């Protein structure tokens, strides 16, 4: 990729007198501190930009955007666009020629007497950088002969200038930015752009003896024309522009941070989170006992006839079925390796995680430019479980595990000593940079964290967006998202995948056919074409028998307790899930006050990682035990119980819960469903899946759960969602993509696409206690708090 950077001195000769940053002892005077020139900072940013583009193969994405967005633009027009794009980096800090910035921030009076902005702008520089960018490129755009190309390139010039203006803050609304250039009489939005424009006019007249050739301000009719061009009527095109702007903003912020840290702290970034060589990882993976068994089966047995598999005993056939699905998925992937969206739908307990791990490695091995893997899970417990599994798979080999990082709110930032052997300030600065920009080849994280990267408008949300380029994304349990967002999610995922060259594997035991919600006719690939034959195999369909007898009576905790006491006599492992934490705690207290001949345990979302691990260890050792839990038990908790009780909610949740029962297929499992708490009161996000007609309160839903025919269930759900999105209200999907996504209303998109509606006011309360981790290791809360205070 040939990057042509503009010489800043040809744009503004005064840059040679300007500084960008200062460092040194804060006790020294401004004049005594070492300073980095504006040209030095700009060149360092350009160098980091070239490195990231090269290492992350970003040119592939840039070329794809040009193909998708400028389908009919001439080579001359494309070249001009590329110059505008790359020189966003060059221009981002040129506004530091502001004399007030130089004097206040740098102690530099070389520009004294030069045109100064008024107090509204003061010592700010980003907005001045944006108007200087516009002044430079609007003049040159006007020389483009083709009218349509001229208009399109002018639109992009404004968009690029907006990214420059916002590179020290959040991505706000593009419309508000344009309105800010209006005259002081315009009451719409702020007028910072107008003040910057007045400074530019004065600067050019007084310092350069020139006039501003092209006015920055666009009148309303011109703005409307621009928004019609950039948004159009195609949702895919709207996503392409939205994704491109986030990518360029992410790159701009990244190179600015890297260059600044390089100068201020001496931290030179050499790796940018890509998998340079996966052969050692695949080699270690294929040497595991499970993989060797699969490969031997592939040579000698695969594929087996379905009739033969049905006749085998349950305990004997389950591994054969898992292997068949593993190889089906692998072969289908190879046949459709050039596609972008893949669905992996397997029964609960079929080994989806291992299948997805193999698929991600196969993609890296076979697809040029793919160089990163994300594993995204709905809960932190699943993240914990899978990083533990990866440690077992790779035998905790340091060279492999160093490439894998957990990114969530619970796990500390990954520390990897390289050139910074001692834990100095430099060491921690690099740790922070790696975390902020996800500079890890393999990342395990949660839906919430990933969605912030995809859609969040705060600067910190967009930091790592460029890391999505040329990556494999494994999405676990997508049905756990709010169903009101499914249409928007699949539209975004398809657009992002095509633009950013992502391979997205969506996996679940209960997977909605999201293709029905999008107008994009490029179908996703079902990795297991004959999935029904697996779902209906007795080993999965009959592993756990659902019992609905308790639904026939008005349930109380006393009635439930009496029923559970009878099951205790069978000396089995019993799991009881409530959808209300209050009910779970009350029932646990009731059981502990009752004389029963087994130990009773409790787990909720408040249980720490350590507490959960201790509970899981106990469950594996005890033959007779009761575990009372909340929904936290549905996923990410590796347990195998004999008998289950569950308060009914979503059908997806019922299936997930049943996956905790009789996982080994060594006996017969049973789950008793009861109706105690209102699911509608628990799920307050309007999810129609908790409507009575879609729960096991209805016999047709009971039949679906028994036969695992979830396609019928989701067919009804999706039909309702499709009709809702066509309604003339705030849920209208066409309006959302055209008016908000297509017109770059970042805060509105962020608000709509967040996963959790948090309505509580939270306050952290730290309680001191002593944890006994082992016979030789204890953690004292008081000591931890004192260490924290000393930081």
Predicted regions, residues:
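Interdomain hinge/linker at the junction between the two RecA-like core domains of SF2 helicases
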Residues: 510-567
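N-terminal accessory nucleic-acid engagement/regulatory domains that precede
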Residues: 1-16, 146-309
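Walker A/P-loop
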Residues: 337-360
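Conserved helicase ATPase motor motifs in RecA-like P-loop NTPase domains
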Residues: 344-350, 477-517
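Inter-Walker segment of RecA-like/P-loop motor cores
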Residues: 397-455
